[in-house]
A protein has these predicted regions:
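Glycine-rich phosphate/cofactor-binding loops in nucleotide/flavin-utilizing enzymes
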Residues: 3, 23, 293-343
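Flexible glycine/proline-rich, aromatic-decorated loop/lid segments
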Residues: 70, 135-165, 293-314, 319
Length: 343
């Protein structure tokens, strides 16, 4: 799935957002009741689109400040959502995972739960579609919830603490794949132009400065791709142990392995998000530089890549937040320990 994400992003990073959000089905599969799984998973498999409705006007990086209200209706036998969500990618999707405040009188993360909203039930209005710098292939919406019916996913009060954390880790893998795809696209565009553009009687790829830039672009793209695949491997092994634990008790050695790969997944996911998104911006910048004045024009794809890349080190957790998340693993020696294993 991650490899496919990368290939889709190489073609169009905006469309990859719609494609990548289908991974919301994994969250439903892992945490939702059997009834909800039977209702939504076949629909998503048949082509229903997904969204994760987390951000609000006053709750961006600080999701603990989410205030969209979920109230239980005894009369209707369902939860009713009221409030506003902002900057929601693919906000008009068919199935939405919504972070909402179910506990009266709370103002922190412990009052938040995860709910699933079905577009067919109504109650949500797209008030605005953002006019964005890039990733124009997917709509980014402001949503108004007015008594929108929704169903609880998993347990109350665990929305941010457990379910969104899992969802965000998967989303950050997706942004890693998206960033690597854009790095590859930028490198290919730059390489193609350098082989075709001639100045001073020779193709510009033969100039040492251009050749060095291309070599660095290739090396960084391959390096961050390796980080993407390795991080995905850590996450996948941890998830497999989790699935096994639902079927039978794990052996002592298996529990130790599960704990180990959970630590690696937690440590390498922010590292991947940080480096891949920053490299995507750098690769897009360098691609335009190699194109010269032509790269500033909309006639060439690198102009679009440059605009698309800019959001990658912002959404699903800014680079600064990834540094904060990684610091704990630096001090605990997670990265150093793994480097020694590679050696």
């Amino acid at each position: 799935f991650v490899m496919t994400n990368e290939m889709v992003a190489r073609a169009d990073a905006g469309f990859e957002n719609i494609w990548g959000l289908q991974d919301c089905a994994e969250t439903l599969n892992e945490f939702a009741s059997e009834e909800l799984k039977q209702k939504y998973l076949p629909w998503v498999s048949a082509g229903a689109t997904c969204a994760m409705d987390l951000t609000e006007p006053d709750a961006g990086s600080d999701l603990g400040a989410v205030m969209l209200k979920a109230t239980w209706s005894e009369q209707k036998g369902t939860w009713l959502l009221n409030g506003v969500k902002r900057f929601i990618t693919n906000g008009d999707g068919d199935v939405s995972l919504v972070l909402a405040r179910t506990e009266e009188g709370t103002t922190d993360a412990r009052g938040l739960s995860m709910l699933v909203y079905d577009k067919r039930d109504g109650g949500v209005k797209v008030r605005r579609i953002e006019n964005k710098l890039g990733i124009k292939g997917s709509p980014t919406c402001e949503l108004v919830f007015t008594n929108a019916p929704a169903q609880l996913v998993g347990d109350r009060k665990m929305g941010l603490i457990k379910y969104v954390m899992s969802l965000m880790n998967a989303a950050r893998l997706g942004i890693g794949a998206q960033s690597v795809g854009l790095c590859e696209a930028a490198y290919r565009e730059a390489l193609k132009y350098a082989n075709e553009r001639a100045q001073f009687g020779k193709n510009i790829i033969r100039f040492a400065a251009i050749s060095e830039m291309l070599s660095n672009m290739k090396a960084k793209t391959q390096g961050v791709r390796a980080l993407l695949y390795e991080t995905t491997r850590f996450v996948e092994i941890y998830k497999q142990y989790t699935h096994i634990s639902h079927e039978r008790p794990l052996e002592a050695e298996e529990r130790q392995e599960m704990k180990y790969y959970n630590k690696l997944a937690d440590g390498f996911t922010p590292l991947l998000k940080l480096f891949s998104s920053e490299y995507a911006n750098q690769m897009a910048y360098d691609a335009i530089q190699i194109h010269g004045g032509s790269g500033f024009m909309k006639d060439y794809a690198c102009e679009r890549l440059y605009r698309d890349a800019r959001i990658m080190n912002i959404y699903e957790g800014t680079s600064q937040l990834q540094v904060v998340a990684a610091i704990n693993h630096v001090t605990k020696g997670t990265y150093l320990e793994q480097i020694k294993r590679y050696e």
